[in-house]
């Protein structure tokens, strides 16, 4: 992603119902990189032999790896650069596996003009199935 890919929406430009998305296919490298950065080396993510003994029968991606794509949408698409996270709730509904394409979507559900806060419904899906759902509140830059 380059600076040319960034989209900035000022608070005054945002409307209820507005949405934005991005998608990423999860690779084995993504899981190992996230494990290293987050220090979450749970064998359910990084050890296939162990993962085969779990309910999932194979390694799964870290839930927060997929949830991070919500942050990417908020920081680069809607509202975009300058957006500051205030709150995020998440419910993890299904696992994400290597090779799955995760689509993160944010949809504006409310505006608080006096604080320049925007609330969003947040979801991550794989093949149309919701794997993460939640709500975010973001402080958004205003014009001038």
Swiss-Prot record:
GO terms for molecular function: (3R)-hydroxyacyl-[acyl-carrier-protein] dehydratase activity; hydro-lyase activity. The keyword Metal-binding does not apply. The keyword rRNA-binding does not apply. It holds the Pfam family MaoC_dehydratas. Residues 13-128 form the MaoC-like domain. It catalyses: a (3R)-3-hydroxyacyl-CoA = a (2E)-enoyl-CoA + H2O. Gene3D superfamilies: Hotdog Thioesterase. InterPro entries: HotDog_dom_sf, MaoC-like_dom, UPF0336/Enoyl-CoA_hydratase. GO terms for biological process: fatty acid biosynthetic process; poly(3-hydroxyalkanoate) biosynthetic process; protein homotetramerization. SUPFAM superfamilies: Thioesterase/thiol ester dehydrase-isomerase (SSF54637). It is an enzyme of class 4 (lyase). Keywords: Fatty acid metabolism, Lipid metabolism, Lyase. Its EC number is 4.2.1.119. Catalyzes the hydration of trans-2-enoyl-CoAs with a chain-length of 4-6 carbon atoms, forming the corresponding (3R)-3-hydroxyacyl-CoAs, which can then be utilized for the production of polyhydroxyalkanoates (PHA) polymers. Cannot use trans-2,3-octenoyl-CoA as substrate. Homotetramer. This is (R)-specific enoyl-CoA hydratase. It comes from Rhodospirillum rubrum (strain ATCC 11170 / ATH 1.1.1 / DSM 467 / LMG 4362 / NCIMB 8255 / S1).
């Amino acid at each position: 992603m380059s600076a040319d890919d960034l989209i900035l929406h000022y608070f005054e430009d945002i409307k209820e119902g507005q949405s934005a998305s991005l998608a990423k296919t999860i690779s084995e490298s993504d899981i190992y990189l996230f494990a290293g950065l987050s220090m979450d080396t749970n064998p359910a993510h990084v050890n296939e032999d162990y993962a085969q003994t779990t309910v999932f029968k194979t390694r799964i991606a870290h839930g927060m790896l997929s949830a991070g794509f919500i942050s990417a949408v908020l920081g680069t698409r809607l509202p975009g650069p300058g957006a500051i996270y205030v709150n995020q709730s998440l419910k993890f509904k299904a696992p994400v596996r290597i090779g799955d394409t995760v689509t993160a979507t944010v949809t504006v559900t409310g505006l608080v003009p006096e604080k320049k806060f925007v609330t969003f419904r947040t979801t991550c899906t794989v093949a149309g199935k919701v794997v993460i759902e939640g709500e975010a509140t973001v402080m958004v830059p205003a014009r001038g």
